[in-house]
Amino acid sequence: HSIGEFWRRWHITLGTWMKDYVFYPFSLSKAMNKLGKFFKKHSKTRFGKYMAKALPICLADLLIFFIVGVWHGAAWKYIVYGMYNGIIMSFSSIMAPVYEKMFKITHINKNARWYRGWQIIRTFILVNISWYFDNAATLTDAFRLMGNTFKHASFSMDAVVKMFGSQLDLIILLAGCLVWLIISILKEKGIVIREALDRKPLIIRWAVYIALVMSVAMLGYISNTSGGFMYAQF
C-alpha cells in the first residue's frame, strides 16, 4: 500500500541489516538527538514539534536509500534510484499529519476497499517509475525512456514474449504471479496457509507438496540456464 511497505517486503535481509546497522545508530545518534531537541525548543506549532521527531527519521531514510543506491552499483542512475525512494518515504513521513487532517475534513475511510485499491495502484506506479533508473543503461537513458513511454506508447504481445525469453517463460511468470496474488490475498485476510493446508485431506496435501518440489526443480533448471543469480555482482 506504500513505498515503505514495499521495501519492507521486497528485500527483507537487506532491509533488516540497514535497520540494525544504519537506521537505528544514525537516527538515535547524539547529532540527531540534538537536532530533535533544537526543533522542539524553537518550534511553537504542533507541526514543528512533530518535525522534531520526524526529521531524524527522514534523514535516516535518505541515508539508507543513498546506501541502497550505491549498493546496487557505483553509477548515478543507482544513486538517483535510491534517493527517489528515500525522498518519497521522507516526504510521506513529513506530510503524515497533513494527510490525517485531510482525512478528517473529507471523511475518507482509509479502510474502504476503493481507498486500499487506490493505494495499491499508486504504489505500483511509483515503484515502476523507479525501475526506469534501475534498468536503464545510464541516467540519461532512464529519462529518455520515461519520455518515450508517453511519446511512443504501443503494445505488442510478440515484444512482451521476446522480452521474457520465450512463451514458456512468460506462462511460468504469469502462473507464479497468480499464485503470489492468491497467497497475498489469503494472508491479508488472516489465513495461515500452512494451518489451512494441514486441515485438508492427505491426498490434497501430498499433491501440493509434489507440485512444490517439481516447481522448485523446474525453476532451478530455468535459473541455471538464464544467466545465474541476479545479485551475484553486488
Regions found by a protein language model. Name each.
Residues 1-2:
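Cytosol/matrix-facing ends of alpha-helical transmembrane segments
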Residues 5-233:
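Non-catalytic, membrane-anchoring transmembrane segments at the edges
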